[in-house]
């Protein structure tokens, strides 16, 4: 089986780390429960977009991002069973090096760069199944769609 797995928010705790990172650096008090939609500018209204997105280019931030419970073990098991595993991300090119070096390949060293697909249009991906936390990434995908539950996608 060819399996596509979104990276941010699906298998890692990016959002939790991002909120903590911003709270410490900017004196804000946002909690994960406050994030009930995609637009983070609404929960951090006092921050500029530059300040809001700055952590995503910081290697130290990506070193602090952890993976969700059992994610590494499940992905490794699927890989060992012979499934083709692809990490499918719509990340900005500016964040790719720190994200991959300090997080993705640190947790999933059995994957190679050939197992990573970068695209803003996940409907182009030719996988049998796609796991994602964003409904808009699954809408036109032609295979089996699995949406990961999150506070920000409850109204999707």
Describe the function of each predicted region:
Residues 1-51:
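Active-site neighborhood of HAD-like aspartate-dependent phosphohydrolases
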Residues 43-58, 82-85:
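Short, basic/glycine-rich phosphate-binding loops at helix/coil junctions
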Residues 62-66, 71-101, 119:
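Substrate-recognition element of Asp-dependent hydrolases with the DxDx(T/V) motif
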Residues 84-86, 129, 146:
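A structural signal for isolated positions on well-ordered beta-strands in alpha/beta enzyme cores
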Residues 88-140:
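Substrate-recognition "cap/lid" segment bordering the active-site pocket of phosphatases
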Residues 131-156:
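Acidic, Mg2+-coordinating phosphoryl-transfer loop and its flanking beta/alpha structural elements
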């Amino acid at each position: 089986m060819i399996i596509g797995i979104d990276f941010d928010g699906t298998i890692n705790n990016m959002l939790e780390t991002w909120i903590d990172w911003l709270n410490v650096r900017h004196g804000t008090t946002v909690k994960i429960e406050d994030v009930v939609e995609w637009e983070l500018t609404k929960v951090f209204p006092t921050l500029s977009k530059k300040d809001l997105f700055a952590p995503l280019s910081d290697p130290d931030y990506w070193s602090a991002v952890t993976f969700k419970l059992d994610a590494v073990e499940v992905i490794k098991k699927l890989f060992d069973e012979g499934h083709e595993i692809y990490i499918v991300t719509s990340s900005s090119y500016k964040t790719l090096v720190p994200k991959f070096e300090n997080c993705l390949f640190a947790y999933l060293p059995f994957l190679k760069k050939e197992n990573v697909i970068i695209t803003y249009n996940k409907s182009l991906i030719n996988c049998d199944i796609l796991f994602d936390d964003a409904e808009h990434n699954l809408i036109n995908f032609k295979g089996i769609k699995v949406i990961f539950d999150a506070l920000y996608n409850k109204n999707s």
